[in-house]
A protein has these predicted regions:
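Short amphipathic alpha-helical interaction segments
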Residues: 46-61, 67-72
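Short glycine/proline-centered loop/turn elements that form peptide/ligand docking sites
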Residues: 17-18, 34-36, 53
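Short amphipathic alpha-helical segments
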Residues: 22-26, 39, 53
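Short alpha-helical segments that sit at the start of domains
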Residues: 1-27
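Short helix-capping/hinge SLiMs at alpha-helix to coil transitions
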Residues: 28-34, 48
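Surface-exposed alpha-helical segments enriched in charged/polar residues
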Residues: 26-29, 57
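Short acidic, hydrophobic short linear motifs in intrinsically disordered regions
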Residues: 33-44
Length: 103
């Protein structure tokens, strides 16, 4: 039986192997109804800040969208004091999350 620390390290390694779009879905699932802005996703996932916005745009505009703007229209301020859209998963996004190999 694995120690909890080993299990969390294994899970983190699996998340890092996901595509960027699937990492967005994974982290939005964790954040639930609170959601996340593009800036928050950059802080969580790391990498190039210009790579997250195209992923959330693609995921929200797909024929079956996996993410959507927060249903209450919630926005949060970023480091530059600008309002940012808060993204949450759609029901299809939750279903897709279940197929990810991180659980």
């Amino acid at each position: 039986h694995k120690e909890p620390k080993d299990t969390s390290v294994d899970a983190f390694a699996k998340v890092k192997r996901l595509t960027l779009s699937n990492q967005v879905i994974f982290h939005l699932k964790i954040r639930g109804f609170y959601g996340a802005t593009n800036s928050e996703l950059v802080a969580i996932i790391g990498g190039n800040p210009n790579s997250i916005q195209p992923r959330t745009a693609d995921l929200s505009r797909a024929s079956v969208p996996y993410v959507q703007e927060h249903p209450d229209g919630v926005k949060r301020k970023n480091a530059y004091d600008n309002d940012e859209i808060v993204w949450v998963l759609t029901p299809a996004g939750y279903e897709h999350y279940k197929t990810l190999e991180v659980r």
